[in-house]
Amino acid sequence: MKKTSFVLALLPACLGLLACSVSNTPNPVRYTLTPPAPESAPAAPAVPFARIAVPAYIDTPQIVTRNSENTVVLNETRIWAEPLARAIQRAVPIQVAQNLYGKKLKDVEKVSVFIDRLDGSLDGEVLISAQIVVSRLTETEMLNDSILFSKSIPVASSEDSYAAYARALSDAVAALSQAVADNLCE
């Protein structure tokens, strides 16, 4: 009798633990940073990138949005399919090369890109700001040209606001890539 009472007393607790282990959390939706479709043109000259730096606060699996000047939100069910820093570090050189096709380049030793901000709101705009450093070697010294880049990209209205947000982030990275290319041309 005591065993039966004990088992009956534990039954609600066991059922509660079982209910907690079977979560109703939806599967995450994965997004990619999509570069523009490559043109069917011959390869452009390779640009020597020394570094493409991304702020740590956006290099998370979760998609980061900003809801005030000093507050960001990480969404647990809307995530990147790959690390965002890696996606940006892959996309920028490809896009720069596409933008340079057929243009005369300055003599460049190396290029560095330091992204300070890349975020925004789902119903507003994406902001990107970065510093582009183009290093050139002269006969006597290394010259560094530093360019500040800033742009806002509107987030299109869409049923899937995160897909529209990811597209705006992609467009912001493409705009940065265009600015890098513009500063490498004679």
Predicted regions and their residues:
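Extracytoplasmic/secreted envelope proteins and their assembly/folding machinery
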Residues: A85, Q89-P93, S170-V173, S177, ...
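Short secondary-structure boundary motifs at beta->alpha junctions and helix caps
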Residues: E69-I79, E139-Q178
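Short, solvent-exposed, polar/charged sequence segments at loop or secondary-structure edges
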Residues: S68, T77-F114
